Swiss-Prot record:
Function: Plays an essential role in viral RNA transcription and replication by forming the heterotrimeric polymerase complex together with PB1 and PB2 subunits. The complex transcribes viral mRNAs by using a unique mechanism called cap-snatching. It consists in the hijacking and cleavage of host capped pre-mRNAs. These short capped RNAs are then used as primers for viral mRNAs. The PB2 subunit is responsible for the binding of the 5' cap of cellular pre-mRNAs which are subsequently cleaved after 10-13 nucleotides by the PA subunit that carries the endonuclease activity.
Organism whose genome encodes this protein: Influenza A virus (strain A/Puerto Rico/8/1934 H1N1)
Record-stated family: Belongs to the influenza viruses PA family.
GO MF: endonuclease activity; metal ion binding; RNA binding
Cofactor note: Binds 2 manganese ions per subunit.
Enzyme Commission numbers on file: 3.1.-.-
Subunit structure, as described in the record: Influenza RNA polymerase is composed of three subunits: PB1, PB2 and PA. Interacts (via C-terminus) with PB1 (via N-terminus).
Name under which the protein is recorded: Polymerase acidic protein
One GO BP annotation of this record: DNA-templated transcription
Motif (Nuclear localization signal 1 (NLS1)): 124-139
Recorded name of the encoding gene: PA
Modification comment: Phosphorylated on serines and threonines by host kinases, including human casein kinase II.
Essential cofactor(s): Mn(2+)
Domain of life: Viruses
Amino acid sequence: MEDFVRQCFNPMIVELAEKTMKEYGEDLKIETNKFAAICTHLEVCFMYSDFHFINEQGESIIVELGDPNALLKHRFEIIEGRDRTMAWTVVNSICNTTGAEKPKFLPDLYDYKENRFIEIGVTRREVHIYYLEKANKIKSEKTHIHIFSFTGEEMATKADYTLDEESRARIKTRLFTIRQEMASRGLWDSFRQSERGEETIEERFEITGTMRKLADQSLPPNFSSLENFRAYVDGFEPNGYIEGKLSQMSKEVNARIEPFLKTTPRPLRLPNGPPCSQRSKFLLMDALKLSIEDPSHEGEGIPLYDAIKCMRTFFGWKEPNVVKPHEKGINPNYLLSWKQVLAELQDIENEEKIPKTKNMKKTSQLKWALGENMAPEKVDFDDCKDVGDLKQYDSDEPELRSLASWIQNEFNKACELTDSSWIELDEIGEDVAPIEHIASMRRNYFTSEVSHCRATEYIMKGVYINTALLNASCAAMDDFQLIPMISKCRTKEGRRKTNLYGFIIKGRSHLRNDTDVVNFVSMEFSLTDPRLEPHKWEKYCVLEIGDMLIRSAIGQVSRPMFLYVRTNGTSKIKMKWGMEMRRCLLQSLQQIESMIEAESSVKEKDMTKEFFENKSETWPIGESPKGVEESSIGKVCRTLLAKSVFNSLYASPQLEGFSAESRKLLLIVQALRDNLEPGTFDLGGLYEAIEECLINDPWVLLNASWFNSFLTHALS
């Protein structure tokens, strides 16, 4: 039969039939009769439409091939033979332009003259039986049905045959020829008997055995069988029933289900106010490193030794002064704290043996910066039960902040490549089980795309700082320990490199509960002048501490070196998660893997190699005001990683709430794009829930602005 089909039908029709069967997961080598039936149906649809046009006067005319008027409008739009997504797009566009009612099932054609969808049937049985099955399935007065048989019979809605006698005769003759050709090859009987009735997927899906018992047991009360329940669900009209049930609950409750259309959603309202400020625990794009290559000094690997060695590489120190004060802080104390660090590091160098850790003297400036003795005294509740006006002290509502451009710049920078590698190949962790070839191949490809990414540097920096701070918090609870902020990487040539970003001084850290806070002062090197974006640095006091010679296109230039100082705090649970930041690599690898899986299932083979090595292909990486941005697979890996890393660096209750609530709206919009006709109730309440998370957090505000870009393009 397969050979017959390939000889008998036009190659384009055969190819479309192959695609259709693949889309529905059917094997044409096994289902050969189905293959022949699909080709026949496609050919009838094309013949139905051939030569029929509409002229300038809106009349239907027949134009044979080679006629000079071939630029006329086609009378029929062919829907059959397109892939499902495209077919629904065509149907929706017809409904929008003509006002036709949207059909429940995909029809085969649209007739622009009669303004109606047409369902074409080709049957090997009695035409009237097949006609009734079709009518029963589509249950729509609006869709016109036209059935042809291989014996030359036909049947159409209200005996309206749409086409002229000659066009229909052409179709009948072709069907008769196909039947004769099959019969002469001994294929007809099997083909005729193989036709099943018009079935929907649900009807064909028989539930038997244990599953059937479970289905019957799990019905809602008052339903005796699955059939009863199905019939009830099929005929269910949601609005009245749900409203009725709700009105029994409370007078205030109503939930009328409103259709969710393209015009329904509005953009999220982002707050107004002063621009938002940087709130990460360490500097990101603005950080500056003092580095040593191929470290081999005594005590290499001991943080304090490494830090001192890095500090010695810089000779441009100068008398520090405040260039951007902290509005609410005592800025001279920040200045004195830095001078104290320099002085105490100098003292260490003068000692014969450098100690492994350094505890700072508890000076007044450090006590102030670390909030020593600032916490209100805790009193046992039993001792003050009788106090009349006992209350929790008032806290102000957080001030609303607007989105600032710096956070998008931070994100863009995080996606970029640096000239160093921040992870070794095995950083993502070996699999415990005997590793599959595909899994390790994917991991190696992914690692090579992200190992040089700036977001990966942030991961390693975050892991180091949080580990060091948690260790010190447990080991030296009462001390103001000096903790260098260090990272390690490899240069392009494979040489090891140790980097110093600055220092942290931790405060008292008697951390009993996971959420108990340890205060710390961070002091970080930078070449960024804070006066360019003062709003970003609201929480910092910035000092100018030296001049650095930078190699540039015009030779060496001297640039001022700044120190960004601020008081900050963290907790055991936050440090625990900070130490686990490598998980971001795993999360983004899994996202990439699901993209590869989707591609592989379409192509029916593993596409890992093609996915990473086909440099010409682009993939969507996100939405911007310009539309959907596309880029190389490497950029997609790095963008997904950066998103995951920023979710960790800027973790907050606002982000938790925004992610959970905006996801609901996202799913509704996606359902609309997939033509699933979603309905909603209390959409206003959903918007409220999303927008109450838009307060002042830079990362949440950026995500909300991306979400608005998505809404614009998804619905345009």
